[in-house]
Design a protein with these regions (language model features):
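Enzymes that bind and transform nitrogen-containing heteroaromatic metabolites
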Residues: 1-158
Length: 158
């Protein structure tokens, strides 16, 4: 399984100033639970936001610049990251450029919808899910945080 996982504002924002512009601990717990024991693939800016490898995961960072960090593998392209990840479960965890390219490899897209409005020209956006390629599942309440909603999209096979 290869999937994309992210939280998004009503405006399609996933980041601002190198940070996630909201704090929802329940969604963080769910992210940890889902991604632990898997491979996570991220871009350099997403890695820089965390500042270190995510524990209990195999971390692959797509970057063209040198990066020397413990427990991190680096590759120059997303295609190389996917090849290096192999056959186990893989989550693409950001940022926007990774998400733009990752849809070509993703089987699922797991989206948390947050109510926080972000109206800032510096905000980083993710494009809407292409529903001609991904079948939307039901919009369901977030099991770990009231007030948030989730939807899982699955690649269409028709």
């Amino acid at each position: 399984m290869r999937g994309m996982i992210y939280a998004v504002s009503p405006e399609g924002v996933i980041g601002l100033g190198g940070k996630i512009p909201w704090h929802h601990p329940g969604d963080v717990r769910r992210f940890q639970r889902i991604t632990e024991g898997t491979t996570v693939i991220m871009g350099r800016a997403t890695f820089d936001e965390t500042g270190k490898a995510l524990p209990r995961r195999r971390n692959i960072v797509v970057t063209s610049r040198p990066l020397h960090a413990p427990d991190v593998e680096t590759v120059p392209t997303l295609a190389e990251a996917v090849a290096r990840a192999g056959d186990g479960d893989v989550w693409f965890i950001g940022g926007a450029r990774i998400f733009d390219e990752a849809a070509a490899w993703a089987d699922v897209i797991d989206v948390t919808y947050v109510p926080d409005h972000v109206d800032d020209p510096r905000a980083v956006h993710v494009p809407p899910v292409d529903e001609t390629r991904f079948e939307p599942g039901p919009l369901v309440p977030h099991e770990d945080e009231p007030g948030l909603f989730r939807r899982v999209y699955r690649r269409r096979t028709d």
